[in-house]
């Protein structure tokens, strides 16, 4: 039984789904998808549970969410292993994901009070109050690259605000979704407050098509996000939060410490095997001998990166991609770029057929035109050379995406210029693109999202503001507007 609906584990009535380790091929999880009828059942359960859950005090909801945080802590090793085995990422990185899930709880509680709590302003004849109310039933679509942390970033603030939820994990990470749901079950959520439906495209389409849905919170690819946006167009009554991908630029200016800059670039481009939405996809490098030296060092260090299994000792920097198909898509993208005129500096290689272990690739595209503006979700970095900083910014902004952007430079003035001109929701200076602060917004503009960033700002899209003018008594004003007569004279 792999679906959690209205407080019970049930068997899916859809197609059989089998999840294997992307490196070893070991079967990790299997179960049936939810069909459309079961998606509808989950929605009805969430709707029935909503009034009581929303009427609980914030403190009562907080107790259950904090209980979940405690369960994450006590089950950290087990959940780390599940995420690592299912995604292919090394144990060390999966452990940081579970830690981020735990830390998200306290941050979300604080964010609720700061961003969506209650405020009261006294007036001469009463008061003006601001409160926030939950939307109702929300669907949460999870991605596969961080199958615990990223859905958690929607689920936790949504529950704290008083919403009820239908959660669909990525079809590529059903085991992680299952494991997290079982911890929520132990946390004692009332039946129907959080429901789990497993499945792929058919399940997702059934979920997003539900009429009795008050909103949808999505993290994933731009293509799927665009489909959801089109599907929900003309329905302003539904909140839609989209956090999508990016064709992210990293600009390398003057560099005092080449190894430090190379380390930052590798952290930006190749961590998580390039499967972070904020990963650097495009590297803009200043022309000249220093740029040449940097590029040579980047290639030399990158070719030492050998992907390994999740439990290898010593631990590798990167593991496998989510699937062999995903790894092959990166290789195909590199071959297409090479055919268009790109100069390969480091060729990506599948270490073994039947696995997703892929080495990083670097290809120079200077002077090549007509390139597709698409995100290649893996360890493939494209390089361009530039002459002036203005040219670098123009090239960096030449994308429909707008998630992250970065600059390596000792000059604050250049960063100030980038802050004014960059088209991105995250703009970093001498920091990896993949770094983020949980107390700052996380999200982008353009094809990267719809201006509803997650992290600290997730509270904003999980509740709507309610304004009130209030007085505990009613009296006739001493001064009336023109034309109003409340005298005792009888009008004849």
Curated annotation (Swiss-Prot):
Its EC number is 1.2.1.71. It catalyses: N-succinyl-L-glutamate 5-semialdehyde + NAD(+) + H2O = N-succinyl-L-glutamate + NADH + 2 H(+). Keywords: Arginine metabolism, NAD, Oxidoreductase. GO terms for molecular function: aldehyde dehydrogenase [NAD(P)+] activity; succinylglutamate-semialdehyde dehydrogenase activity. Transmembrane segments: none annotated. One of its GO terms (biological process) is arginine catabolic process to succinate. The active site is at residues 243, 277. The keyword Metal-binding does not apply. Catalyzes the NAD-dependent reduction of succinylglutamate semialdehyde into succinylglutamate. This is N-succinylglutamate 5-semialdehyde dehydrogenase. It comes from Escherichia coli O6:K15:H31 (strain 536 / UPEC). The lineage of its organism: Bacteria, Pseudomonadati, Pseudomonadota, Gammaproteobacteria, Enterobacterales.
């Amino acid at each position: 039984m792999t679906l959690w609906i209205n407080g019970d584990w049930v068997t899916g009535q859809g197609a059989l789904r089998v999840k294997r380790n992307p490196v070893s091929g070991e079967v990790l999880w299997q179960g049936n998808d939810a069909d459309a009828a079961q998606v509808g059942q989950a929605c009805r359960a969430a709707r029935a549970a909503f009034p009581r859950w929303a009427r609980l005090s914030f403190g009562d909801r907080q107790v259950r969410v904090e209980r979940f945080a405690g369960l994450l802590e006590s089950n950290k090793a087990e959940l780390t292993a599940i995420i690592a085995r299912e995604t292919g990422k090394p144990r060390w990185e999966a452990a940081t994901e579970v830690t981020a899930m735990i830390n998200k709880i306290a941050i979300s509680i604080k964010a609720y009070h700061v961003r969506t709590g209650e405020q009261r302003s006294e007036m001469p004849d009463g008061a003006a109050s601001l409160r926030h109310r939950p939307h109702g039933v929300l669907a949460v679509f999870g991605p596969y690259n961080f199958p615990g942390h990223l859905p958690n970033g929607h689920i936790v603030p949504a529950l704290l605000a008083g919403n009820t939820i239908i959660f669909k994990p990525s079809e590529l990470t059903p085991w992680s979704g299952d494991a997290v749901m079982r911890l929520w079950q132990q946390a004692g959520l009332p039946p129907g407050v959080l429901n789990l439906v497993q499945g792929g495209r058919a399940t997702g389409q059934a979920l997003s098509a539900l009429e009795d849905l008050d909103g949808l919170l999505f993290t994933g690819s731009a293509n799927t996000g665009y489909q959801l946006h089109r599907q929900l167009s003309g329905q302003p009554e539904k909140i839609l939060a989209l956090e999508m991908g990016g064709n992210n630029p990293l600009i390398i200016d003057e560099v005092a410490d080449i190894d430090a800059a190379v380390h930052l670039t590798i952290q930006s481009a190749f961590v998580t095997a390039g499967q972070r939405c904020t990963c650097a996809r495009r590297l803009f490098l200043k022309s000249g001998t220093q740029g040449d030296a940097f590029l040579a060092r980047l290639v030399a260090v990158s070719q030492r990166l050998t992907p390994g299994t999740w439990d290898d000792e010593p631990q590798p920097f990167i593991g496998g991609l989510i699937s062999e198909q995903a790894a092959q898509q990166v290789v195909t993208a590199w071959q297409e770029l090479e055919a268009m005129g790109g100069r390969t500096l480091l060729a990506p290689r599948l270490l073994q057929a039947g696995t997703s272990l892929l080495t990083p690739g670097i290809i120079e595209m200077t002077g090549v035109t007509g390139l597709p503006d698409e995100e290649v979700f893996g360890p493939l970095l494209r390089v361009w050379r530039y002459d002036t900083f203005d040219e670098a910014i123009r090239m960096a902004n030449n994308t429909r995406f707008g998630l992250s952007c970065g600059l390596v430079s000792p000059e604050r003035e250049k960063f100030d210029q980038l802050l004014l001109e960059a088209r991105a929701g995250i703009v970093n200076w001498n920091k990896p693109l993949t770094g983020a602060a949980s107390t700052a917004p996380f999200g982008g503009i353009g094809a990267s999202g719809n201006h509803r960033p997650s992290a600290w700002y997730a509270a904003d899209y999980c509740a709507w503001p309610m304004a009130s003018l209030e007085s505990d008594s009613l009296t006739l004003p001493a001064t009336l507007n023109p034309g109003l007569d409340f005298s005792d004279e009888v009008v004849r």
